[in-house]
Swiss-Prot record:
Induction: Up-regulated during the differentiation of oligodendrocyte lineage cells and during brain development at the time of myelination. Down-regulated in the hippocampal CA fields and dentate gyrus by seizures. This is Serine incorporator 5. Keywords: Antiviral defense, Cell membrane, Glycoprotein, Immunity, Innate immunity, Lipid biosynthesis, Lipid metabolism, Membrane, Phospholipid biosynthesis, Phospholipid metabolism, Transmembrane, Transmembrane helix. InterPro entries: TDE1/TMS. It comes from Rattus norvegicus (Rat). Pfam families: Serinc (PF03348). The chain crosses the membrane at residues 37-57, 90-110, 125-145, 157-177, 198-218, 230-250, 259-279, 310-330, 391-411, 428-448. Glycans are attached at residues 113, 183. Belongs to the TDE1 family. It is a multi-pass membrane protein. Restriction factor required to restrict infectivity of gammaretroviruses: acts by inhibiting an early step of viral infection. Impairs the penetration of the viral particle into the cytoplasm. Non-ATP-dependent, non-specific lipid transporter for phosphatidylserine, phosphatidylcholine, and phosphatidylethanolamine. Functions as a scramblase that flips lipids in both directions across the membrane. Phospholipid scrambling results in gammaretroviral surface exposure of phosphatidylserine and loss of membrane asymmetry, which leads to loss of infectivity. GO terms for molecular function: acetyltransferase activator activity; phospholipid scramblase activity; protein-macromolecule adaptor activity. It catalyses: a 1,2-diacyl-sn-glycero-3-phospho-L-serine(in) = a 1,2-diacyl-sn-glycero-3-phospho-L-serine(out); a 1,2-diacyl-sn-glycero-3-phosphocholine(in) = a 1,2-diacyl-sn-glycero-3-phosphocholine(out); a 1,2-diacyl-sn-glycero-3-phosphoethanolamine(in) = a 1,2-diacyl-sn-glycero-3-phosphoethanolamine(out).
Length: 460
């Protein structure tokens, strides 16, 4: 590693320089992207010990196989076997520290418009000191007095924050559906893109119908599972309702771009949430004619799959981290932030393209051609920020609360462990059901709002 690269990495950790990879074969990194990835890396660093804290089996293995583990636990006054660092209360405290960390930066970076200011330098650099600050905040949360009051209050704060995090994701899904359809419709006259749009709509409807049909086969029985039957019937009816509403003459009159692509995407998402809710539902056990306990309303292979708890748990936890990280990245782009504030680009500026959602964060700069050695960073925010710094930290704050509530099984926290993460609970079931219904209502509102308020200008 060259001296210039070492100096660059030191400037990244202890100064305001951007972080990137040094080797010549590695791609160049925009500062706007590398900063977000670093914060997500810190976010993941906190989630990992939270998962360990919710796993009694992992803590037992650590006690048995790590030398001087008990001495270490006594040294930090965490109990003989670190029992004070295990369970939902420990996760609450660690996530409280992480939420405070992102709240501080949310306030600090409010109204930052370019990367030249002092506050922007703090946001984009000084990673070593920020890691120390994050560790200090998470550790300091364990010294909060009056544990019972703190946990009760923080639980409801976490529930409210998680609700807003879910709402942001649902709003962006609806916005993405409208933007996707509008973008592809812009090219139907010149490049026959409507063929692809129609084909994709048919594929998505096939997925939705097939998914509901498979759930009807595996999650219902002829003489039982009435609640699952009602649930599938209601959600199938909602998919039909939004599809008919999207192509109705009154909606088409106000929104000529409305078609089957948006409701097809929403129907697929409703189907996914329905499946996710059914898999999160507590098992229903009845006695058969021989007096044996039998689990019903779930597929047989699902019972076998759940028995391998370690594989299901850690794969599911990994998927949770990936999905939340992706949500934080996609919901903090400038276009997504503007969409949440009902600010959209002019329709005539839309260019039809298949991969519009993967556009660059910013234009290439001259520095892209000049970086030859050392950290390969492209400073793409000198003229203006690519994303809202404050909003990015706000989303990560909400994501911290969402992770906290998800890992501790929402309001069934007393007996929650990471090993029973996918066993199911009514709290998780109803959260996913509410998310599903809210998504449908949000999409319906985008269709009927121009009809209810004709004097107002709506654009999506």
């Amino acid at each position: 590693m060259s001296a210039r690269c070492c100096a660059g990495q030191l400037a990244c950790c202890c100064g305001s320089a951007g972080c990137a990879l040094c080797c010549g074969c590695c791609p160049k990194f925009r500062q706007s992207r590398s900063t977000r990835f670093m914060y997500l890396f810190y976010f993941t660093l906190v989630i990992i010990p939270c998962c360990v804290m919710m796993s009694p089996s992992v803590m037992k293995q650590m006690t048995e196989h790590i030398p001087f583990f008990e001495d270490f636990c006594k040294g930090i006054k965490a109990g003989d076997t670190c029992e004070n660092l295990v369970g939902y209360s420990a996760v609450y405290r660690v996530c409280f520290g992480m939420a405070c960390f992102f709240f501080v930066f949310c306030v600090l970076t409010f109204k930052v418009n370019n990367s030249k200011s002092c506050r922007a330098s703090i946001h984009n650099g000084f990673w070593f000191f920020k890691l120390l600050l994050l560790g200090a905040m998470c550790s300091g949360a364990f010294f909060i007095p009056d544990q019972e009051t703190f946990l009760n209050v923080w639980r409801y704060v976490g529930a409210v924050g998680s609700f807003f995090f879910i709402c942001i994701q649902l709003l962006l899904i609806v916005e993405f559906a409208h933007k996707w359809n509008k973008n592809w419709t812009a090219g139907t006259v010149r490049n026959k893109l409507w063929y692809a749009s129609l084909s994709l709509a048919l594929i998505m409807y096939s997925i939705a119908v097939g998914g509901l049909a498979l759930m009807a086969v595996f999650y219902t029985q002829w003489d039982d599972c009435m609640d699952n039957k009602i649930l599938l019937g209601v959600h199938g009816g909602l998919c039909v309702l939004i599809s008919l509403a999207a192509i109705s003459p009154c909606v088409q009159n106000r929104q000529p771009h409305s078609g089957l692509l948006q409701p097809g995407l929403i129907s697929c998402y409703v189907t996914y949430l329905t499946f996710s809710a059914l898999t999160s539902k507590p098992e229903k056990v009845v006695k058969d004619e021989h007096g044996k306990n039998v689990t019903i309303c779930v597929p047989d292979f699902g019972q076998d799959f759940r028995r391998d708890e370690s594989m299901v748990t850690w794969l599911g936890t990994l998927l949770l981290v990936v999905c939340i990280s992706y949500s934080c990245l996609t919901s903090t782009t400038r276009s997504s932030s503007d969409a949440l504030q009902r600010r959209y680009g002019a329709p005539e500026l839309e260019v039809a393209r298949c991969c519009f959602c993967f556009g660059p964060d910013g234009e290439d700069t001259e520095e892209q051609q000049n970086v030859k050695e050392g950290p390969r960073v492209i400073y793409d925010e000198k003229k203006g920020t690519v994303y809202s710094y404050s909003y990015f930290h706000f989303v990560l704050l909400l994501a911290s609360l969402y992770v906290m509530m998800t890992l501790t099984s929402w309001f069934h926290y007393e007996n929650a462990t990471i090993e029973t993460f996918f066993v199911g609970s009514w709290s998780i079931f109803w959260v996913k059901m509410a998310s599903c219904w809210m998504c449908v209502l949000l999409y319906l509102w985008t269709l009927v709002a121009p009809l209810c308020c004709p004097s107002r200008q709506f654009s999506v």
